C-alpha cells in the first residue's frame, strides 16, 4: 500500500521544469554563476543560482544546496558552497526556499517569513509537498543542463534544509548522495 502511494507521489511530482535562464556573472575568477528560475508545483517559479566552472570538458557532477530557515540563494554558505564546488569541477544549484529571498512576498526577515497562516489540516501536507517538490524539480532542472551528468547529482542541506533533504532523498531516486548538517 505505502509503496504504491510512494510511486504515485514520485510520478505526479516529476514533470518538465520549463526552466528559464536570466543572467550570468563571474563572482570569482574561473567560476560562472547564472541566475535562473525553474518551474515547480502550481505554476510557481523558483529563483536559483547555478555555479559552474568557466571551462570544463565532459559532463560534470552536480550538487543542490538546500537552504534552511532564514537562508536563501545568497546566504554565505550557499555562495561559498557554489564557489568551492565549481572551482573543484562541479555544478552547484542553490535556490530560494518558499518564504525566503525572492519568494518572501511579505518581505519579512529571518524565520518570520514563515508566519503565513495556512489552515492547519492542510498545512503539513501542502507545505511539505511543496518544499520537497522544489528539490525534486531542482534535480529535473539540473538533469536537463548540457554540462551536467544526470547520474551524478547529489544534494546537501543546512539547518531546516537538512530535514527537507532527508525527506526528498526518501522519494527522489535520481539523487545519488545526500549530506546534511
Predicted regions and their residues:
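Short, flexible micro-motifs
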Residues: 46, 71, 102-104, 160, ...
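N-terminal pre-domain segments of enzymes
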Residues: 1-17
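N-terminal cap/lid segment of alpha/beta-hydrolase-fold proteins
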Residues: 16-58
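Glycine-rich His-Gly loop
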Residues: 40-42, 65-70, 159
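Short alpha-helical segments and helix-capping/turn motifs at coil-helix boundaries
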Residues: 33, 76-80, 163
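Cap/lid segment of the alpha/beta-hydrolase catalytic domain
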Residues: 58-59, 64-144
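Primarily recognizes the serine-hydrolase "nucleophile elbow" in alpha/beta-hydrolase
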Residues: 88, 137-181
Amino acid at each position: 500500500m505505502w509503496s504504491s502511494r510512494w510511486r504515485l507521489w514520485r510520478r505526479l511530482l516529476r514533470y518538465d521544469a520549463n526552466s528559464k535562464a536570466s543572467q550570468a556573472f563571474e563572482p570569482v575568477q574561473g567560476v560562472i554563476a547564472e541566475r535562473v528560475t525553474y518551474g515547480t508545483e502550481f505554476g510557481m517559479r523558483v529563483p536559483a543560482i547555478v555555479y559552474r566552472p568557466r571551462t570544463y570538458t565532459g559532463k560534470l557532477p552536480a550538487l543542490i544546496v538546500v537552504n534552511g530557515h532564514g537562508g536563501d540563494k545568497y546566504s554565505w554558505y550557499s555562495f561559498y558552497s557554489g564557489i568551492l564546488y565549481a572551482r573543484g569541477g562541479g555544478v552547484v544549484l542553490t535556490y530560494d526556499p518558499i518564504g525566503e529571498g525572492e519568494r518572501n512576498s511579505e518581505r519579512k526577515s529571518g524565520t518570520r517569513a514563515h508566519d503565513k497562516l495556512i489552515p492547519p489540516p492542510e498545512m503539513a501536507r501542502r507545505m511539505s509537498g511543496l518544499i520537497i517538490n522544489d528539490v525534486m524539480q531542482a534535480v529535473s532542472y539540473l538533469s536537463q543542463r548540457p554540462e551536467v551528468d544526470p547520474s551524478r547529482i547529489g544534494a546537501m542541506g543546512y539547518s531546516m534544509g537538512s530535514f527537507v533533504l532527508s525527506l526528498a532523498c526518501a522519494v527522489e531516486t535520481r539523487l545519488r548522495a545526500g549530506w546534511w548538517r
